[in-house]
Structure formats: structure tokens, C-alpha cells
Amino acid sequence: MSKSTAEIRQAFLDFFHSKGHQVVASSSLVPHNDPTLLFTNAGMNQFKDVFLGLDKRNYSRATTSQRCVRAGGKHNDLENVGYTARHHTFFEMLGNFSFGDYFKHDAIQFAWELLTSEKWFALPKERLWVTVYESDDEAYEIWEKEVGIPRERIIRIGDNKGAPYASDNFWQMGDTGPCGPCTEIFYDHGDHIWGGPPGSPEEDGDRYIEIWNIVFMQFNRQADGTMEPLPKPSVDTGMGLERIAAVLQHVNSNYDIDLFRTLIQAVAKVTGATDLSNKSLRVIADHIRSCAFLIADGVMPSNENRGYVLRRIIRRAVRHGNMLGAKETFFYKLVGPLIDVMGSAGEDLKRQQAQVEQVLKTEEEQFARTLERGLALLDEELAKLSGDTLDGETAFRLYDTYGFPVDLTADVCRERNIKVDEAGFEAAMEEQRRRAREASGFGADYNAMIRVDSASEFKGYDHLELNGKVTALFVDGKAVDAINAGQEAVVVLDQTPFYAESGGQVGDKGELKGANFSFAVEDTQKYGQAIGHIGKLAAGSLKVGDAVQADVDEARRARIRLNHSATHLMHAALRQVLGTHVSQKGSLVNDKVLRFDFSHNEAMKPEEIRAVEDLVNTQIRRNLPIETNIMDLEAAKAKGAMALFGEKYDERVRVLSMGDFSTELCGGTHASRTGDIGLFRIISESGTAAGVRRIEAVTGEGAIATVHADSDRLSEVAHLLKGDSNNLADKVRSVLERTRQLEKELQQLKEQAAAQESANLSSKAIDVNGVKLLVSELSGVEPKMLRTMVDDLKNQLGSTIIVLATVVEGKVSLIAGVSKDVTDRVKAGELIGMVAQQVGGKGGGRPDMAQAGGTDAAALPAALASVKGWVSAKLQ
């Protein structure tokens, strides 16, 4: 009996756990602290700093089932999804990793045992082929002599990409950094399927499918291209769960595995489709996975960066649902079936199900309003098309007006064998594309980063000053032995009370000092396991090995502690007032303010803001104890501790509790009791992206200062209105009513003046072929009065063409009016466009009335003078 996808995932993890590997949970799809990467796209992403020597773990062997997304940037599979057997936007990468522990021998033996042992995957040995890098004799011999694979099934792959080490079988993290040869394992589906072994001209066929890639990181590539052997070689492997499931379930397409069969049936049910072979079902089944998990990991649909990629995927799915005949919103209904089919890998998603469904539903409803009109416009353009390519300008117009991503337009065109001029589209939309598509590789030169082998012990929970020793100094990213007065540097100590920026809390400031020197610390940051004090040596000199006294700015730290504790109280209060869908999406805690981003689909009502504020202040008055406990991560989650979005946690974590009101994982610094906070006030609530709100708040002395400021403003307003704070609202209402009355009277006077001006103007009209033409520049007339004047003049003049202009603060306002009986010969929109072009502007409107603006007031007289000749030509 074949294993289910969930069973295969668990078997992989169980196998490597039995081989001494730590089972590590999948990291977020949003890479932590890695601006070089759009989405997590491989199992090794969360271990990148470990491989680079910037981070240390308490284990040297790990195994994961990592959620990955490839859509956008270098790894863009979107346009192929649904049309091929193995392309996905979302997939799970099974992997095992060695950080300086085992190397080639064990890595290969582990892979062979898992794949072929009757206890595990039990694949026929004769169906497995392998490739190795051309010069990797060690791997070749292990496969041949120890594993026993015949030579004809071991293929050496050289530099097949046009440069040294540019090979399918040589992996590198970037232009510099860790790299090394890899060996890949292929499964032969049999001669009933077309295709040849890897390295052959027919390798693109579907007969031989790569199922596992094992990378041997044994070199550090320098900027000049030289390869230095790594002191502790490592192993990074990746096997696509969906691919190995297809092999083990004896199907040739990933979309035929149990997971996708179930999802496809769910898609058919919510869309009303009956043909289960329809490619649109595959597209939607794939896309619900990437969309749901991206939203669960904090990405919201938007027009920038990750949010734009998410929006593209959602809209592509909705369009395919439209093709299947879906009559109402359907996409969000697939979140439940997805959770069911993902098993243990869907637990994070289940906790946020309501929020994910709401975001998908809202986005689909917004897009549905324009989808029909956009498709109609595209159909119209395709009907007019004489060749086989849609121009880029039309593709851009569809994006700009209807929100059609270009790949959605390309999808529609592809079904009709029509290409899209993507170069033309890119030219029209270069800036948007630059923002939306970030580089997706490991492009940063990590050799230039500060790398510290030593670790710093943080003692700032209990101390604000202590003595330490300088273990490293860096100037401009380079290690030095000493610094002198006036130099900016990063100072690393063996132990420190300074808190390094983490979890939204800013780094400490303060001073490092000794008998003959003073170093002003302006920021504190982490460098792997070391803590770096960033600042400037104010006096004296400092060298590695010197003893220092480290003093944190105590008053600043105290204000930060209050703000951080208030952030936890507010998070819990938001979940009580708004609902448990609220989860933290980001935060900033400094000594002046706390800023908190959270998931919520609409602006908070004033009464909700007040309720949160009151609830937090109630907890402050309760003077709850703030306690910390160190425990296992799983135990903390079982206790209900909330985790911070985007943070990485060790297996042992710090749990912060405030009585019975709040429990969160947190490594920051906090007050001793909630009463220390004193007072909490929300000063703003706003939106930052679709489905994400932001609150800014102040505490303690800062909150009291805002109370005083509000009181002072009220007193000032009361004084200006000659009242007091008790009757202030009545006074304001009275002033507003008087203002409205005066504005009404002023408007009446303006209309009377305009009517009089119109009467005076009518006598200036001239006759052009039986039509009255009036062209005039007016001074002292508001632009919005021009329309009223044109209406009056049309009533007075009968068959007429009118052009009026006025200049206010250097800006030209134009209006053209044409009586109905003349619009067959002269259209107001064309006339105003001709005039506006001459004054550096543009405009438009109906055939009988059109408006425009311009910036070149000096050109106005000549532009108005050109009207008579233009009109005369039209009326001939």
C-alpha cells in the first residue's frame, strides 16, 4: 500500500531523527533578516547564517520539511504552474543538514538507505541513477564501491553553463561564499515514457526525474574566484515532497498525488466544474497553497514587493475560477480543505484560518468587480489584432486600469496562441516592476560582513553596568587590533549589559570607559553570537584585550522597558477587543514611542481604540507581576505563549508573563510590574497595507506629556472662542454654523457676479459661419465658476462655441462649451485638448463640455488666439 503525502513527510523526518538529527520546524515563508531573498525557496534558507559561520546552533545535524514559494524574481515558476506536471508556486522541501559534522560518506549512505530500505521507501535500486560533479572522484567512488551502483548509472556532469564551476552539479551561495559539488539522485519511470538520462540530449523528457540533490559545501569562494577549502565541510540536501510522493504513489504527475487529488476535488466542488482534467483546477489547487501560507506568514496583498506577488497569484486563481464558471467568491472556501489535507504541516494555518479566509475573500471581491470589464477590453483588443502579438501598451493599460498582472494577460493570450510584447510592457512599467520583483539569489558578499568567532554573554537582564574585556574591534567592517580617539568602530566584549536590537526593541546606548578612554555607544547590534557596540571613541585609545566598564544609559533603558511591556499588554488587549485573528506583524519599541503592526481588516472604530486603551490601563492599575521563565519551545506553545512574527527561536525560549493577562515568547527587557508603566495612551491608528493596521502609543512620562498637551490645546481653543472647556463643544458648533451661513452668502454673491460677467461677455461673441464664437481670459474668477458661466452663455447665445480661461497662482484652468446643434462638427473635448496642449496641460470631457488644466500661463494668449482658426476650419 502506497504512503500518503503526510506519511511520507513524517517518515523522512523520523528516519533522520533516528540518525541523530534535530527535527526543526519549517521557518516562515518571509525570510528572517535576509533582504537578498524575496521568499523562502529552499530548506537551507533558515540555516544560511549557520553555514556562513555567523550563527551557532546547539545541534550539528538537522532535518526539516520546509515550506517554500517560487513565484517572482529568479525562481519564477508562475507561468508554468498548471501547464506542466511538476511546476508549483508552493512546495515542501524535505532536507537533512550537517553543520561540520558528517560529510559525503554518511550523506550518501543515509540517502540510499532511506530510498531503498524495505523499512522506509523501498524503491527498486535498479531504477535509481546518480550524477556527480565531473572532478568529484570521492563521491563517484562512494556511489560505485560502497553503495554498489553500476558505472553506467553514475554520470559525471562538467561545467555545462559556460564558465568554471558553472554546472548543474556545482552549487554556490552567491558570487562569493560557501560552495561545492553536489550529487543528484534520479528515478527512472521506465521506457514507456519519453526521455533520456541526465546529461543526454533527451534529458528534458519525463522518464528520468530528479528526486534528491545533495550538496557538499567544502569550499569558500573568494572575490578573485579562488576556492579555499572550508575547515569544517557541511552538507545541505533537498528533496521535493511532491516529487517523491509521485514516485512512491506510482504516478507521473505531481498533480495526481493524494494531496492534489483531494484539493482538485475541492476546487471542482466550489466552482461547479465537472471535468477533473481541466488545467484550471490544477492552477487553483496549487495557488491556494501558496496564497494561504503566505498570508498566514504575514504577507498581505498590495502593489509592492511580496504583497504584489501574492496579489498576482490570487488574481490568477480567481481568473481561472471565472473560466470554470464560478459565479460567486470561491477561493477562500478552499482554506478549510487545504488545512485538512496538509495534516501536521497545516497547524499554523489552522490557527489563523479566519484571518486568511477574510483576506482572500476581500481580495477576490475587489478583483471580481473589475475582472469582467478587463476581460471584455482584452477580448476587444484581441479581436482587432492582426498579428500574433499583443502590444505592451495594451498589457500595461490592463494592469494600470483593471489590476491585471501581465502574467494573467499572458495566460489569456496563451490560450489563443497569442504572445504578449513583454519588453513593451516592461518599458511602460519599469518602476513598478523594479519594486515588485526583487533579486532572489544570495547576492550579498558575506565575506565583507563582520564575522566574529567569539560569543558575548548578555547580562543586561540583571545589570546595567559591569566590567568586560574587548574581544574584537572592527572599523569599516574589518577587524583591527586598536582604535584611536575620533574613530568610529564596533566593539565586541566577552560580556555586556547592553541589549542588542532584536524582536522590535532597539539596541541600548551608553558608554564604554576606562582610566584613559571613553567610547560613546550609539547603537548595539548582534553579529552571530557576538554583541557589537557601535559608536565613536571620544578620548584615548582602545585595543583588543583591554578591560572596560560598560555602562548602559539607565534612563533610556527604563523608558524602553515600559514601552516594551505596554506592547505586550496592548497585543493581548487587541485580541480581546477585536478578536483572536489579531496577530503581531511587526513592532518598534524605543525610548519615545511604541509602534505595533497587527492583522485586522478594517480601521478601528473610536470606541474600539478607547476599549483597548482602557483595558491596558486596567492591567496597569492591577500592578501585575511581570515574570520570566525559561522552557522548551513546545512547552511554551502548549502554555499558550504567543510567538513574534518573523522571529527565529531556539529550542529553549524565554516566556514572559503578566499575571493572567498576557503570555508571550520574548527576549526583550521589561518592567518589574505592570504598575511601573504608569499610564498608556494611543496616539494614532492607521493602515500600512491590506489587512494590516498600525498603532502608535506612549507610556509613563510620555503619556502624561500628551495629556498636558491636549489640555493646553483645549485651553487655547477655549480662550480663542471666549469660552471655557465646559461649553467648548457648543461654542465650536455655533462657529461652524455661522461659517456655513457666511460661505453660503459668499457663494451667492459669486454666482451673481459671474452672471453679470456672463452678460457682459456675451456681447464680445463673434460670428463664424453662423455660429457664435466666444474666447476670453478672465481675471479674478475662481476656476469652479467657469462652468456656471459657460452654461449661462450657452443659454444666451444659442448656436455657440465658448472657450474661457483663468489663471490662479500660475496654473491655467480652461473650459470649452459647445451647443448641442454644433457637436457634430466641433467637439468640446477635441477643442480643449488642442488649447491645453499649448499651455503644457491635458484634459477632456463630453462633446458639449470639456475642461483642462495647464502650467504655462505665458503661452495662454497665443493658445486662445489659435481657437478662431481651428474652429473656422472645422465649420467650413
Curated annotation (Swiss-Prot):
Which GO-annotated molecular functions does the record name? alanine-tRNA ligase activity; aminoacyl-tRNA deacylase activity; ATP binding; DNA-binding transcription repressor activity; identical protein binding; peptide lactyltransferase (ATP-dependent) activity; protein homodimerization activity; Ser-tRNA(Ala) deacylase activity
**SMART domains noted in UniProt:** tRNA_SAD
Q: What is the effect of changing R70A?
A: In mutant 6A; abolished binding to lactate and protein lactylation. In ATP-binding mutant; abolished ability to mediate protein lactylation
Q: Which residues carry this modification: N6-acetyllysine?
A: K74
Q: Tell me where it resides.
A: Cytoplasm
Question: How does its activity get regulated?
Answer: Acetylation at Lys-74 decreases the alanylation activity for tRNA(Ala); a protein that is fully acetylated is inactive in vitro.
Xref: Pfam families: DHHA1, tRNA-synt_2c, tRNA_SAD
Q: Which CDD domains match?
A: AlaRS_core (cd00673)
Q: Which reaction does it catalyse?
A: tRNA(Ala) + L-alanine + ATP = L-alanyl-tRNA(Ala) + AMP + diphosphate; (S)-lactate + ATP + H(+) = (S)-lactoyl-AMP + diphosphate; (S)-lactoyl-AMP + L-lysyl-[protein] = N(6)-[(S)-lactoyl]-L-lysyl-[protein] + AMP + 2 H(+)
UniProt cofactor(s): Zn(2+)
Q: Impact of changing G240A on the protein?
A: In ATP-binding mutant; abolished ability to mediate protein lactylation
**Top-level EC class:** ligase
**Per the UniProt entry, what are the Gene Ontology biological process annotations, in alphabetical order?**
alanyl-tRNA aminoacylation; negative regulation of DNA-templated transcription
Q: Which GO terms describe its cellular component?
A: cytosol; membrane
Alphabetic keyword roster: Acetylation, Aminoacyl-tRNA synthetase, ATP-binding, Cytoplasm, Ligase, Metal-binding, Nucleotide-binding, Protein biosynthesis, RNA-binding, tRNA-binding, Zinc
Q: What is the effect of changing C179S?
A: Inactivates the enzyme
Which intervals of the chain are annotated as region Catalytic? Answer: 2-461
Can you state the subunit structure given in the record? Homotetramer.
Family membership noted in the UniProt record: Belongs to the class-II aminoacyl-tRNA synthetase family.
Q: What is known of its domains?
A: Consists of three domains; the N-terminal catalytic domain, the editing domain and the C-terminal C-Ala domain. The editing domain removes incorrectly charged amino acids, while the C-Ala domain, along with tRNA(Ala), serves as a bridge to cooperatively bring together the editing and aminoacylation centers thus stimulating deacylation of misacylated tRNAs. The editing domain removes incorrectly charged amino acids, i.e. Ser-tRNA(Ala) or Gly-tRNA(Ala) become uncharged tRNA(Ala) and the amino acid. It is specific for the acceptor stem of tRNA(Ala).
Q: What's this protein's name?
A: Alanine--tRNA ligase
Taxonomic source organism: Escherichia coli (strain K12)
Q: Which gene encodes it?
A: alaS
